[in-house]
Each structure stands twice: as structure tokens, then as C-alpha cells.
Amino acid sequence: MSTTENLVELEHLTKRFAVKQGVFARGKVEVRAVEDVSLTVRPGETLGIVGESGCGKSTTARLILRLLDPTSGTIRFEGRDISKLSQRTLRPLRREMQMIFQDPYSSLNPRKTVGQIVGQPFAIHGQKNAKTRVQELLETVGLSPEHYNRYPHEFSGGQRQRIGVARALALSPKLIVCDEPVSALDVSIQAQVLNLLRNLQKDFNLTYVFISHDLSVIRQIADRIAVMYLGRIVEIGDSESIYEHPKHPYTAALLSAVPRPTTGGRARIVLSGDVPSPVYPPSACVFHPRCPRFHEGHCDVETPPLRELSPGHAAACHYPLEKWPMTDDEIRQAEGAERADRPHLEGTAHEL
């Protein structure tokens, strides 16, 4: 990884949380929230991180900002290792890294005015008399300077999220982590906020890490996409490549669930079972208990590396997809009638 070309670099990043086994249990177990994640974020781009709830995407976002301390691995910002920096040493760097939170209702202090909320970063970093700058920020995000003395309860959800965006912009950061910033909003308001974020990125040369569980939202804003499952990145590549030529079965399943105006021959891939516990993850490939391309003695024994399958497109799968979309017949052929038949899928795995 080049430290001169990337704004953010993660190398073998791992985060585990110790939790009690039960009410009466004395021992503790580890929740493997993020496991051996390596990726880069380039200046001026939007990297989307997508996956089901509990896959580790929000934990990864907080690790990037050092809101959480990593268990192991390296976090670099502009080439500088910030993995083990103290909070005091990190403080000047906070100007360069900001966050937009998921819930616009709980992320704003109801006892403070909009002016106090947006102006808080200035106060923390010792900048006084920032009223004019705060009013300019409100205009920048589509609000009126007259809103300066109002309280959060006087605004709609979309307006509250704009206040959160203004707060994130206050110190002119280079990186903004957007943790599902539109998931709590109506669809029509989602589009407005996404358009705002795109325009701000162009105007201020911002870099985004955009977290979402919704692939249709990610597609509208991301330049590259990383797909996470059970704490690991299973696929990463350019947005167009991920959507048009997914290589990992999990990515294909997520894409098949995105509503489309016309099916166009694309079939729905329904995964069996639930997401395994991050306390006791499956051996080798963590996706193998739910995978329609499971090969006994291989997928459950050997962990697939995240390997490049085409320029800029990598997937962690022993048997990556070669065809997309798939028809109902092809999916049935790959899945087999019963789990017991899966060891015999070797012949069909290479046909898909």
C-alpha cells in the first residue's frame, strides 16, 4: 500500500470485544466485530462499505476515526500511523476527520440551539466568535441563517441531518465518515441528502467513507464498494464492476434482493439460515454455512484470501461467480436440492 496515494490505509485491522457469556457466567468470550480488514481510501473518492446488520461496517468506521481502539492492525491517515496515538495527540487530527451519524434525532442535543450545535467544533478547538461562519455553513447545506437560534425539535428529519452535515463541515475536514446517514429518512428526503453530499464533495474536495446496508443507496454515491460479512471484507472493487459482475456469492445475493422495475431474467437468491454468531464464527470461509457454492473439505477447511480477480476487483472466494445475473434454473442447479448434495456441486460451480 502506498502511503503517498491514499488518505486512509487499514492493514490487518482487527477489533474484538470481551463480553460475558451469560447472566450467571463468570468467564468472558470475544465478539469478533472486525477481523483482518485491509483496505485503502483514496483522496476525493467515496468508498462504500455495505453489509447486513452486525457485519462490522459501523465498527470499521469508528476504528478509522479512532473512536474505538483496535485490538490489532494498523490505521494510517495521510501516511501517519494513528493506531496507538493517545487521545491528546489525536486531538489536532480530529479537525481532518469528521462523522455524520445515522440518527438525526438522537445525534443532536435537544437542549442546544442549532448555532451551538454547529459551532461546537469551533469551541472545542478554541475558535471564538464563529457565528458568521456557522450561518454560512447553514446556507451551504440548504438551511437559513435565521435557523441559528432554533432548536432541533423545530426541524424535520431531513433538516436535522443537514444540521449534522453542517457540523461535520465546520472545521473543513479532509475525510467524512457517513454512518448510514439516510437510513432513518424517507426515500424522497434520502435523494435530497445524497445530492447534497455529492455537491459538497465536489465543492470542498471531500473524501467519504459511506456506510450502508442498502445497495441501491450505495450505488448512487460510491466510487468503490467493499462488501463485509461477519467482520471480514469478502469483495471490493469499483462500483460498476461490483454491480455488473459480482464475484462473491454473498454480494450476488445482496444484489438479487435490490428491487428492480423489471426482473430482466434476474432471479432472487435466497440464503438459507441466519448470520452466524460473531462469538463463534464458522471455520475457514465464514460464509460457507449459507453459501450455495459450498464445497465440503475445501470451503470449511481453508480460508479464502482476498485475491484480485480482475483489475481493481478482488473477492475472498474459492469458487467465484463467472456469470451474472443468474436465472432460476441456474440458481437451483448451484444450490442443489438439499445440503447433503453440496459436496457434489463441483461440476456446476465452474459453469456459473
Predicted ranges, named:
Residues D81, N129-E146, L255:
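Conserved ABC ATPase "signature" region
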Residues A170-K174:
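A short, proline-enriched helix->beta-strand linker immediately N-terminal to the Walker B motif
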Residues A18-G27, D69, K84-L90, Y105, ...:
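ABC-type ATPase nucleotide-binding domains, specifically the catalytic core motifs of the NBD
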Residues T4-N6, V19-A25, E30, D238-L345, ...:
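Short catalytic/signature loops enriched in Gly
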Residues Y151-F155, Q159:
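Conserved ABC ATPase signature
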Residues L175-V177, P181, L185, I189-A267:
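P-loop NTP-binding/switch modules centered on Walker-like glycine-rich loops
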Residues G73-D81:
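Conserved ABC transporter NBD signature motif
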